[in-house]
Amino acid sequence: MSESNIVNILVTGSNGQLGSHIRRCSKQSRHNYFYTDVDELDITRYADVQQFVHSHQIDCIINCAAYVNVDQAETDEENADILNHAAVENMASIMADNGGILIHISTDYVFGGNKNNTPCNEDEPTNPTGAYGRTKLAGEQSILASKCRHIIIRTSWLYSEFGKNFCKTMLNLTSTKPSINVVFDQVGTPTYAGDLAEAICTIVEKGLDKGNEGLYHYSNEGVCSWYDFAKEIAQQAHHNSCDIRPCHSNEFPSPVKRPSYSVLDKTKFKQTFNLTVPYWTDSLAVCLSRLGNLETHN
């Protein structure tokens, strides 16, 4: 799959945050993209995926599908595992058989939180503290076990104009509530889905060389808490009437312990693919601008 070859690419979970952005940024691609979600292709059914891959001569799968409800996964781990692990194992096995490549999206939740408050690199020991992280890690491990060609990208705090996410929730709350409490003791980096999608599309356009396969980390540049993120959202959106107050995580009881520090080290990604990663506040401005345009045209 060199730069000159035309390849057939299957995007699963194409109606989600990342999939929607890949649909947008791949419009000018010379490659052939096939976009599916659960209504078009049930990735938990091996035979269905195998038939789709064979009939459309798929060279690359970009798997954006996932069970992402972190809290619900604690009482629904079986279904979380089906989507985050078993379905991934299916795709990895199929791509191993046909020699194609699987680009898979994983998460910072495979880590329990770095107690040294230093960015996590790809070699950092994993230690998921909940069902969501466990099932996502199992998905990663199934890819490695399959020996298929792969690029696994762990990301964090994904948000966008599409779907439900922290940014859109904060926009709603800060425009309707006199005050809100947001946790300050969970630190990481937001990732604008548009940036990650552009990075993935650029990797595909440059050519899926065997030397670039492996495990990578990607988020926007910078570090913040959820409280910092909320404050920046309100400031950029000019929602100045809402009093945003910092609070401890234990003030929001949750069935799963979230990582206290999960900043991802992106050095390997940037060096391998020679890509610049935008700072998180700049990307937030892009997202808010696009959200404004979407609201104007709806």
Task: Give a label for each model feature.
Residues 141-188, 193-202:
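NAD(P)-dependent short-chain dehydrogenase/reductase
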Residues 215, 225-231, 248-287, 298:
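Conserved C-terminal active-site "lid" loop/helix of NAD(P)H-dependent oxidoreductases
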Residues 82, 87-90, 110-153, 158:
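Catalytic helix-loop patch of NAD(P)-dependent Rossmann-fold dehydrogenases
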Residues 7-25:
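N-terminal Rossmann NAD(P)H-binding glycine-rich loop of SDR-like oxidoreductase domains
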Residues 75-103:
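NAD(P)-cofactor binding segment of oxidoreductase domains
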Residues 46-85:
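NAD(P)H-binding glycine-rich loop region in Rossmannoid oxidoreductase-like domains
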Residues 199, 206-253:
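Mid/C-terminal beta-alpha module of Rossmann-like enzyme folds, strongest
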Residues 27-49:
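Adenosine-cofactor binding site in Rossmann-like domains, unifying the SAM/SAH pocket
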